[in-house]
Every structure is written in structure tokens, then in C-alpha cells.
């Protein structure tokens, strides 16, 4: 529904609103003629060219565009009322300003609970033949994927829409898993809707079934682009930083081109230059290619990635090839003068998925991987340090048992767009061998196991747990071992007036044993400690607990959405054989605001004010941080390539 801005809930507001209604009193009739209503309330409606089609549980009704909109659910009636109001208001400059000044659109599709499965809307149409597939592409600005018949574009919206080329219809069709003449598979349609939403140039997508009879149906695919031209700026000081400019959807083809210019006043070859080019879904294969080059500030990096994921539950094969070349200088933290470092890395992997149960999406996934590190120039290193700078070959194999489906919800990591939250579980066992320059006559064996589980409780919210245990064995001697445990929770949405509140809890524990000398854990920003720096504090174990409460505001200013948050973080670093009581503790409390426009490709803008009650000695504290945050992605239960559990 629509709400009135909180700050106008004063004696002045009724007067403004009354005057506004006076100018537009004939915008919407109080009593509609019974002839203009339908007895059966449809589930939803959508606009096709010059008609409005309504889809109920049984029938399809077509009304000419000249008829009064049918009687529907109250939320949609409110939308019709305020859209009519806006049309009338737009005819007069004063009333138009009053409308924009007083009224805020509120998305009534947000659900408090995280329980709706992504394939629920398609189950009753299972087995029906697909007659036609229609593509409808909405403009970036002034449209709503949940109400595509309504266009609220302002003059500024129309100007920006003209500077953007919507994704080519052929590109959308190339990303579809179904074809004309197929029978409807609820799992396949829900997978496909998620695949479209995950494209970097798509803001949101819907796949809608239009039943024609008991045996036939049309498919309507709705997509809404993001405004694909964007940029970013990384601030590292008055004389150091980086500027980027990118286009994520070149002339609607789904290709991405980006440029980067890092600079440092103390570097002789400043500024640097970088470029990357990405092609998504090459020739309908769902294979992505990324080519990149960066030169400057004493660094040179170039290479490419060619990869295909298990994009859907029915995908059988996934794999990738990655080759990277790096030339730089490094002092390894101890040398007086940085020394040259030159190496390249090769990464090849292949996975095969076997779908065991379609209803629960249970799969067995086996995979193999080969990694090679070739070092041509570097400082002197020891066998028990700087593993990544050693010459080595590694062979890995994995066996995974995966169960995964999705909830469809919003207001978790995003600010209104549809989010796909996985639920299910994953058990993966990884085994491999490593040959490096320090162990020429004897290989190291790697063994690791990982388990993760996630599910929503209707009353409490969503819970996620993951754990991992792994080590290398050199003969019978364990090396570079790790144990990790992570638990995440976020609550159902709680209404507070016209705002929505969600609470987040994160628990993370990592323990390393027999790690290399240079391998340690630190307090880092990913654990909630933005604005803190202390290179002298480290440990082999780390325990972190983070609490955050987020208030999502209904305010929508030219597509910019606001979320206010408060946080409390605690972490402790301690040695392998120490207890937490003997460790070094760090705590932070504070609040902040995040601003995001889902129509744009820019990062989330965050202002964070934090207080550190008792930081360790020699710490550098920045209580106020301003940063661009990337949109977080939920953990899923896909196996991915066979991997080493990271210690970080």
C-alpha cells in the first residue's frame, strides 16, 4: 500500500493532503459499478499490449483497455487509486510536487516469514504443455516487477530509460531452460526464474503460467534490467585509491566491459590501468568467459576464467579453466626492500551431478581438480612458510551428497528485490595429493570433510550451520590442519509502524593446528571490525560473535532505499593451546545507515559509526567509516569444485 511520510504526521499534514485531494477529487470513484467487477478475485494480473489479462485459479478473463480495472485485492485497489491520483496530479505542477513530496510507495508483497518455496506457484500446472513463450521486458525506472501494468515513470525516469538499452530478447531466451512444446516442470521453472535473477544485468524476473485449458498454457517471462552503466571509487588515503568505470550489459547483449585506474602518489608508474571483458552464457551453453589485464603501481596481472556452474538441479556437468599470470614485488613482511615476484597459476576442474530425487532435489556430485603453481622469480622462502609462493602440483577429488531447494523472499541482503534463499544440506568429502618443491620424494595427502545445513522455522526464522575439518598428511604427520564452525541466523520480519525489522546473529569459530609460520588469524572487517587495524595482533584460533538489527525504511527516493542498523561485535584471538580467557579480545558497538538503489549496479553505500571500548595496544581506530559494500549472497548447498578449506 502507500503510506504518508512519518515526518508529516503533524497538524500540517492533513491540510496538505486535503488540498491535494481537492485538486484530484475525481481521480477514482468511491463506488464502482457492479458491471465493472468480477465475482472471482484473480490471483494476479498482467498487461499484454492493449488488454488486461486476469489469471484466476480456473479462468482467464480479457478486458479491453478502456474498461475500469476489475475489483481485486485491497492492496491492488490501493495501487490503482494512487496511480490514478498521480495521473491527475501530474497535470498540475503544484499537485505533482505535492504528490512526490507527501506520498511514498510501499511494497505490499513483502512477506514476514521465510517459508514460501520457489516452485509452489507452479505445482498445480505440472505436466501441462507449453504452447507459447512470451517475453516482456520492463523499463529500469518507473516500473514494478510485481505490478507490471502500472507505470509510474517521471520525466527523469523516462530520460534515464532512454539512455539504457534493455537486454535483447534473444539473450533472455538463451537463458531459458524450457522450450515451446515442453511440458511444465515446476522445479525447472523455479530454477530458471532464479537463474534470470542471478544474471548481473537483471534486477528481477518472474516466470508466470497463463493457463489456456486443462492441457495447454502460455509462459510469460517478465524481466527488469538494472541500469548497467556504473562506476566505483576506493579511497585508501589522500594520495592513494582506485577509480573504476564499467558497463555490465553492452547494447543489451549481456557482455560486460570495465576499466580501472589505481593511483598512488608514491609509486613511479602511477596511475595504473586495468581492463576486463566478460561474456555470460556463450552460445546458450551457460559457460561464462572473463578476460582481464591490470598494469601499474608495480604490479602486472593478466589471465582468463572460463567456467560453467551447476546452474540448475538438472544440470549434469560443470567445470572451469583458469590461468593467471602475476608479476609484482613483495617484502614478505620482513625484507628491507621488496624483491621481484613472478609466477603463474593454472586451475582445471570438472564435476558431474546425478539427480537422485526430483522432489527434494537430492543429488550426488563427484568432481576432480588439478592445480599447478609455477614460480619463476621470488625471495627466498622456507618449507614451512609462504605455501602460495612455492612450486607445486595438486590433484583433488570430491564426493558430495546435496539436497537443495529455495525460498523466495526479500529484505534480507537486498532492499526490496526478490531474493532466493537456499535450504537443504550438503555433505562433502575431499581427498587429494600435493607435490611441491620441498617434498620432491614424498607427496602430501589432503583429507577434508565439510557439512552444512540450512532451514527456515515458521515461527523463529532461518538457521544455517556449517562445519569443516581438514588436514594435510606428510607420512603420518599432520600439517596445515583446520577446524571451523559457523552458525548464522536471521529472524522473520517484524513490523514497526511502517518499517520492517530483521535481526541477524553470526557465530564463527576457526582453529588451526600445525599451521605454517606465516599463517595466522586476525581481526578483519569481514568479522564486523571495519575501521580497526592492528598488524601486531594475531592468533591460531579465533572466536567471533556478531549481532545486528536492521530497520528497513519504506522511504523510496528516486529508487534509493534506506536501512538503518545497530550492531555489537565481539571477537577473541588466541594460540592453538590457549583458552579464550587467555586470548586478546576486541569488541565494537555502533550504528549506521546503508543506502542502495537496486536499479543501479553501484555497491551499497554504507556509513558506519563504531566504538571500540578497549582495543589492544598500537591499534589504529577509525570510528567513522564510509564505504561501498557489495551485496551479500547466502550460502548455498552446491558442491562447487573440489577445494581446500581456507584458513583466514
What are these regions (language model features)?
Residues 2-8, 27-478, 489-648:
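Immediate N-terminus of the mature polypeptide
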Residues 17-21:
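Hydrophobic helical h-region of N-terminal Sec-dependent signal peptides
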Amino acid at each position: 500500500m502507500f503510506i504518508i511520510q512519518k515526518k508529516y504526521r503533524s497538524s500540517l499534514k492533513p491540510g496538505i493532503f486535503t488540498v491535494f485531494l481537492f485538486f484530484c477529487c475525481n481521480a477514482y470513484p468511491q463506488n464502482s459499478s457492479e458491471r465493472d467487477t468480477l465475482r472471482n478475485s484473480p490471483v494476479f494480473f498482467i498487461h499484454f499490449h492493449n488488454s488486461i489479462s486476469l489469471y484466476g485459479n480456473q479462468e482467464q478473463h480479457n478486458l479491453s483497455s478502456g474498461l475500469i480495472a476489475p475489483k481485486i485485492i485491497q492492496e491492488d485497489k490501493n495501487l490503482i487509486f494512487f496511480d490514478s491520483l498521480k495521473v491527475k496530479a501530474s497535470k498540475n505542477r503544484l499537485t505533482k510536487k505535492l504528490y512526490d513530496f507527501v506520498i511514498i510507495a510501499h511494497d505490499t508483497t513483502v512477506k514476514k516469514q521465510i517459508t514460501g518455496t520457489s516452485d509452489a506457484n507452479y505445482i498445480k500446472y505440472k505436466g501441462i504443455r507449453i504452447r507459447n513463450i512470451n517475453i516482456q521486458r520492463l523499463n529500469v525506472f518507473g516500473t514494478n516487477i510485481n505490478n507490471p501494468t502500472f507505470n509510474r515513470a517521471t520525466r527523469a525516469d523516462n530520460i534515464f530509460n532512454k539512455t539504457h538499452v534493455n537486454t535483447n530478447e534473444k539473450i533472455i531466451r538463451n537463458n531459458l531452460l524450457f522450450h515451446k512444446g515442453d511440458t511444465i516442470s515446476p522445479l525447472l521453472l523455479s530454477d530458471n526464474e532464479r537463474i534470470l535473477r542471478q544474471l548481473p544485468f537483471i534486477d528481477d524476473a518472474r516466470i508466470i503460467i497463463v493457463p489456456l485449458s486443462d492441457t495447454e498454457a502460455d509462459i510469460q517471462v517478465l524481466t527488469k534490467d538494472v541500469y548497467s552503466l556504473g562506476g566505483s571509487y576506493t579511497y585508501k588515503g589522500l594520495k592513494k585509491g582506485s577509480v573504476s568505470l564499467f558497463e555490465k550489459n553492452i547494447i543489451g547483449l549481456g557482455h560486460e566491459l570495465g576499466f580501472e585506474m589505481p593511483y598512488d602518489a608514491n609509486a613511479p608508474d602511477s596511475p595504473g590501468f586495468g581492463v576486463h571483458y566478460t561474456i555470460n552464457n556463450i552460445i546458450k551453453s551457460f559457460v561464462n568467459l572473463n578476460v582481464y589485464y591490470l598494469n601499474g603501481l608495480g604490479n602486472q596481472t593478466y589471465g582468463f576464467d572460463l567456467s560453467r556452474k551447476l546452474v540448475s538441479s538438472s544440470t549434469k556437468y560443470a567445470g572451469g579453466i583458469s590461468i593467471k599470470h602475476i608479476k609484482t614485488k613483495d617484502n614478505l613482511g620482513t625484507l628491507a626492500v621488496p624483491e621481484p615476484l613472478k609466477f603463474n597459476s593454472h586451475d582445471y576442474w570438472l564435476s558431474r551431478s546425478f539427480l537422485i530425487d526430483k522432489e527434494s532435489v537430492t543429488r550426488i556430485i563427484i568432481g576432480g581438480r588439478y592445480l599447478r603453481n609455477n614460480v619463476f622469480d621470488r625471495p627466498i622462502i622456507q618449507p614451512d612458510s609462504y605455501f602460495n609462493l612455492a612450486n607445486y602440483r595438486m590433484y583433488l577429488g570430491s564426493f558430495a551428497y546435496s539436497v537443495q531447494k529455495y525460498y523466495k523472499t526479500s529484505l534480507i541482503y537486498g532492499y526490496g528485490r526478490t531474493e532466493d534463499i537456499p535450504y537443504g544440506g550438503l555433505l562433502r568429502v575431499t581427498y587429494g595429493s600435493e607435490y611441491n618443491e620441498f617434498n620432491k620424494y614424498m607427496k602430501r595427502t589432503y583429507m577434508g570433510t565439510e557439512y552444512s545445513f540450512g532451514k527456515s522455522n515458521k515461527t523463529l526464522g532461518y538457521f544455517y550451520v556449517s562445519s569443516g575439518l581438514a588436514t594435510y598428511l606428510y607420512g603420518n604427520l599432520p600439517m596445515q590442519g583446520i577446524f571451523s564452525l559457523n552458525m548464522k541466523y536471521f529472524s522473520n520480519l517484524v513490523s514497526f509502524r511502517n518499517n520492517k525489522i530483521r535481526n541477524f546473529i553470526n557465530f564463527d569459530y576457526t582453529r588451526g593446528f600445525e599451521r605454517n609460520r606465516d599463517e595466522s588469524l586476525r581481526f578483519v572487517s569481514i568479522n564486523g571490525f571495519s575501521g580497526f587495524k592492528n598488524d601486531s595482533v594475531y592468533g591460531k584460533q579465533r572466536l567471533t560473535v556478531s549481532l545486528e538489527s536492521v530497520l528497513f525504511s519504506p522511504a523510496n527516493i528516486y529508487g534509493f532505499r534506506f536501512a538503518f542498523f545497530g550492531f555489537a561485535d565481539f571477537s577473541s584471538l588466541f594460540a592453538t593451546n590457549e583458552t579464550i580467557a587467555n586470548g586478546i579480545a576486541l569488541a565494537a558497538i555502533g550504528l549506521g545507515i546503508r543506502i542502495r538503489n537496486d536499479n543501479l549496479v553501484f555497491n551499497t553505500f554504507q556509513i558506519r559509526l563504531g566504538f571500540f571500548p578497549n582495543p589492544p595496544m598500537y591499534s589504529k581506530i577509525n570510528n567513522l567509516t564510509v564505504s561501498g559494500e557489495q551485496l551479500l549472497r547466502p550460502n548455498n548447498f552446491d558442491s562447487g569444485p573440489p577445494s581446500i578449506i581456507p584458513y583466514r
